[in-house]
């Protein structure tokens, strides 16, 4: 039996809706395409993507309506990722963050996939970067990636659910969403990254930074300059250490546990850089500068940010100005996420109209004021029943005041109240 590739391509790239399901994977780097003569050419059952095939292809699975035998074939694909699936996956990632408190390890997953980029190598995928290669065991075994198998286990169910998202996009989507949901800035992301298809395409070990090299500042520049990043971007990206912990069994750095990490909703242990180590802010720079607590981690590469004159200019600025840090971090994170990537379509895919983000946790900062939008809403509801600040309800002036105060207190508690719940991580 033969099936027209052009016809299948037309079906995929038209407005016809096709159901999606994950393809069967194999350790082999060469795809095996099975054809069954008993399969009806009109019984297209599902479309699936697989790490066996380049992301310029779909795997078409055709199921017989009676005996269930299937046919697989390769057909052209329209883009590396599907925008609708990206939007849905982002919402699922928020739920994952809410339940697993895995912000740091997802940030690290995206970083380490992109951070192998070498600007001096033009050819893709030899240049490294954000290409999904970190899903292969060969790269997961690199010393710098210790522990990231846990991140892949969290991501794989999402990949199974959303087969029309590349691994490279899913890693970067998870990383950016984790920053945003921890209270950080919105990252101006684009998607459409093409995946590598075989472990032979993984970069060699040694492209990621070390925590304690002999000359920390020089080492940071060697690694990040190779990626095409500058001093400002090095310092801004280092600020992401406000999230997470170091574990001696993975990196060789940090204490087994501290007073900040011995308990929590997730796996305990490790040493954090900050007290509230799952809240994204500029605490990292403040804590390094002050060195006020032995239970907070300061690596040699962290200390270098306040020792090297060029780095220090930015570190001092970020310690004092969280808005400046957020702005520079968002730009640097977006740039990092694109390093080395091959986009399909070439201009990338921008997600728009994403639902309002879920704030994963709030830390107590004292009394909070109602937002202007909430105040307007309360006033509109009050005026709807005949009252206003200038013209109170005629029935009972003092009763109206008591009711208004009660409503304000209730809404303040519900929407702006203190919540001392903490994050945990991996």
From Swiss-Prot:
Source organism superkingdom:
Eukaryota
For this UniProt entry, the molecular function terms from Gene Ontology, in alphabetical order, are:
heme binding; L-ascorbate peroxidase activity; metal ion binding
The record's active-site residues are: 112
Note the site residues: Transition state stabilizer.
Answer: 108
Give a yes or no for keyword Cytoplasm in this entry: no
Binding residue positions for K(+): 242, 274, 281
Specify residue ranges for compositional bias: Basic and acidic residues. Answer: 246-260
**UniProt keywords, alphabetically:** Calcium, Chloroplast, Heme, Hydrogen peroxide, Iron, Membrane, Metal-binding, Oxidoreductase, Peroxidase, Plastid, Potassium, Thylakoid, Transit peptide, Transmembrane, Transmembrane helix
**Name of the top EC class for this enzyme:** oxidoreductase
Major place of residence: plastid
Residues passing through the membrane, by range: 397-417
Residues the record lists as binding heme b: 241
Reactions the enzyme catalyzes: L-ascorbate + H2O2 = L-dehydroascorbate + 2 H2O
Which topology term describes how it sits in the membrane? Single-pass membrane protein
Q: What is this protein called?
A: L-ascorbate peroxidase T, chloroplastic
Query: What is the source species?
Result: Arabidopsis thaliana (Mouse-ear cress)
